[in-house]
Amino acid sequence: MATADLILKNGKIFSVKDDNTIIRGEAVIIKDGKIDNICGNDEALKYEGNNTEVIDCGGNTILPGLCDAHCHPSIAAAVYAGCDLFGIYIQENETPDEVIDKYLARLKDFVDSHPDNALIRGTGWVQGNFITDRKPARQDLDRICSDRPVILESFCQHSLWVNTKALEIAGIDKDTPDVYAGEIVRDEQGNPTGYFKEPEAMDLIKMNVPGYDFSVEEYKDAFLFYQSEFANKYGVTLVQDCMHSDNAREAYVQLAKEGKLTVRARGVYMLEPGAFGEQLPQFINRKGSDDVGKDFRIDTIKIFAEGMFVLKEPFTEEFISENGMPKGYRGTPYWNDEDLGKSIEDSMKAGFDVHIHAMGD
């Protein structure tokens, strides 16, 4: 019997066979970087040699790996190469102005240290800090940077906060029509405030400010950072990026082909209301063309059934009334029932899984 390179003993071991049968044991035998056996502690003694490393798991549970079925690793590009607004400590009693000042202080540090960036991008601010009439506005960002476009995405990717320069470059003003699935927040005169809610409104900025998206190389560097600093450290072995750009998708493909992924990744094709009749046949024809073995694959259609509500308090009838919404308000559906049902049915017939963003009724 060959000796093991590594033995994990005295654990509660759970694994799965190819036929989905659960395997239980007390020890894991590892040889040449692969699991050779899962067995009891007594049997594990047979695999010990002079050069075998033995780790006592102390009765802890050992799993083969965690799968994060809804995450956004590509956001790492905005953290890695942009202004990181995550991790700013906000106290419960702080006013919106005090919160904004904290965000602006972090932004100023980034702007001052990146004088050559033609575009300032970032992510991580939280809409739930602004449930009063005071909302993030372009004038706030103008105080820090007015000569370059500033585009800050919220932590959840459902809102944008931009400065006046970004609005000018995108050609957005009071005459810009409202969108159905989202909101261009406006002041009393109808001028855009620089606050955009939900993807359809956000795309007015993203699609019209040159250089908004990160490059393929920036995404590759960012995912390698995410992979080593987060996924590998916390036992995540598979991630599904549930909203990503074409550049991010290409970054995954290249990393997989280069053999640099230690985390399996899955992407999505985004199906939009009103356009699914043209989009879905394209996705069906493309299915499999982006796949790289088991390391990267796109076999999921993503649908936004509605938007997102970020609050510090429950979504009650009292809250609805206080915020001027009609009694019984349940949000705004992005799809009619017939189109939504057909898009799901046709996607599944084509062999796709369907991933639906839905937070309400």
Where would I find each of the regions flagged by the language model?
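Divalent metal-binding segments
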Residues: 3-9, 14, 20-282, 299, ...
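Acidic (Asp/Glu)-rich catalytic clusters
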Residues: 255-259, 286-293
